Amino acid sequence: MPQRIELTSEPVRKPRSTESSLLRKIQRACRSTLPEPDLGLNLDVADYINSKQGATPREAVLAIEKLVNNGDTQAAVFALSLLDVLVKNCGYSIHLQISRKEFLNDLVKRFPEQPPLRYSKVQQMILEAIEEWYQTICKHASYKDDLQYINDMHKLLKYKGYTFPKVGSENLAVLRPNDQLRTPSELQEEQERAQAAKLEELLRSGKPDDLKEANKLMKIMAGFKDDTKVAVKQAINNELNKLKRKADLFNEMLTSADEPDLENEAIQELYGDLKSAQPKFKKLIEEERDDDALVSNLSKFNDLVIQLLKRYKSIKGMKEEELNVPDTNEPAKELNLIDFDDDTTANTPSVTSPSKSLQPFDDLLGDFNKVSLSSPKSPQENDTVVDILGDAHSKSSGIDLLDFDSQPGESKTALSAYSNSIVLPNGLLNSSSNSKEITAQSQRHILNQSDHLRIDYELTRESMTKLRLVIFYSNISSDPITNFALLVASPKGTTLSLQPQSGNMLQSNSRDGIKQIASVEGISVNLGKPIKLKWKANYCTKGDSKEESGTTSLPTI
């Protein structure tokens, strides 16, 4: 007999959902009402799995598998996008789950025996994912022996006549292991997490052979610190030897010529590797302080790396903030060329009464009352400052983007530290009069480089009064960068137009992960002085909000 609806003295309570927090997060990230895959929601799922571990990787993969095969194309596309984020951010625990035979069979369950003339969107994404796994973790991961079923599925599909799409180099680079130096504690933590994930899967299987393997693994885990101490030291020595070879090559490239080509990609990559590894030396020395020989070698190598970084920066003309070697000859005022948040000091010249004789480029961005923030979606507006992502909080936060803290006559001096870091291209203009055709060569320059973020740009001249910039954003750290946004200001009397960024997330150690095109109108060929741009970058990494800012001088072309 069906239960009647009637009023009672008991309070009405909403029935509790039987779904776990993880499943709710996955459903939210893959719901069909989304216009496109939401990277923020996908990363939220990845962070949840990394924090919980245990059975969550398997639970997530099973939920994604059901969404892929439920018949809803849009939900399947979102589920595969989520799976891609998990594979790239959750490590071995997810890699072990996608290598299970049951998962791979269900993933291709809707593939016909004979390949169709044209693949569906879901089939195309599945083939691309399997090819990406095959080219990266199945070949280069230290645990590649645990991923044999992915190799088998790749061979089977190829035998059936399926063709795999070409995977972009940036996607392959994310999953390939990097050569970054790691401390013993980091190596131990990584190994323990991998062993715990494997033990979880072996116990869940319950097969006799798997239980025997689980018994061996538990013995290894119980005596991990003693049994694998030699292996950990060997891994550290291998990584140090790789770094020493890089340091020798870097030193040779810096000393092989009187004026080394610092724009060379190999030199920049070696510099980035050594710079990111140098802070780890202190941790290694602290953790291995009982090993006198290793500590001595590390101290000597650390001194060598610091000297190489100093030499590179002295050639490049960069400030040595990370190495704590300030330039004592430079006025303190010039060290703070741009400050988006600090109040104006008493020594700062007043901006309310500029001289009448100032030219537009002398009074750089001086008329603050007319400055506004604009979105890159409407580049036709003549706004001087552009908020690349059009964030609402950027437009109302009251930040004074255009306080350069310098008088017009000091513009050249105040930019000396920054302009020295830019190599002025020669022969960019090949014209004897304004009526002749302007030709420009594209050369990459470094706008800024920090511990996490590197910004490069290529500068060309499109017309007698217009410059074009192609800006590249790279992540030089081992942690992903999310919610990336940039604010840029150009001089008064010019018009800065920006196209939208190609994205707002940078995977770890990704080069040119985001690209953007900008143009500055109103820069005459005969100006005769460099133009400076003011910028501020905001992003998140490892859960912390970061902010970088500065001023750069564009080469005269």
From Swiss-Prot:
May play a role in the regulation of membrane traffic through the trans-Golgi network. It comes from Saccharomyces cerevisiae (strain ATCC 204508 / S288c). It comes from the Eukaryota. PROSITE patterns: GAE, GAT, VHS. GO terms for molecular function: phosphatidylinositol binding; ubiquitin binding. This is ADP-ribosylation factor-binding protein GGA1. InterPro entries: ARF-binding, Clathrin_a/b/g-adaptin_app_Ig, Clathrin_app_Ig-like_sf, ENTH_VHS, GAE_dom, GAT_dom, GAT_sf, GGA_N-GAT. Binds to ARF1 and ARF2. Its main location: Golgi.
